[in-house]
Amino acid sequence: MQNTVQALAQCRDVCITIDRASRQGRDTIKAHNKRYQSMSYVSTLYHIVLRTHCSELAIAEEHENELYAYMNGIINSYNGKLYRIGGMPDHVHLLVSLPATLALASFVKELKVSSSKWMKANPHFPKFTGWSQEYAGFTYSIHDRDKIINYIKGQKEHHKKMAFAEEYRRFIEANEVAIDNRFFMKDA
């Protein structure tokens, strides 16, 4: 059985479906957060980059806000905060704050699975076949927030000068993450 959660973003109501197991997992996280809320002071700000499978141009500009609203609903359901979302037909950048008790990998997995199901069922994304297995996630100080927000806002203009593969590689290298070229941007 599935539950529906309402999300409002960019003046659009978007219904998102989340399976019962995911709902129970979030309830456990919320209870855990509430239990430790008065004891911990943590700021987690992530810049997450998701790429479509095989870099397909699957996110049409005229419908990207629907996807962004849907993703915002998922973020809200995890008690996260979306500061900015934007991208191009083959990738999405998100700047989010997540609860300290929520592992980034678990969140990204749920974000990709849920949004993938939604996009495949939505006629506005006929070219979408899934997200790439890889993703990039970088932590930042709250003092970097405005700089990253502006960077994400400027995606359309930025990609007139630089291809996504180059941008992606630069982000990864700037964050001192080792790249294995045998697997970099290669989908099975």
Regions found by a protein language model. Give the residues of each.
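Basic nucleic-acid-binding interfaces
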Residues: Q2-A188
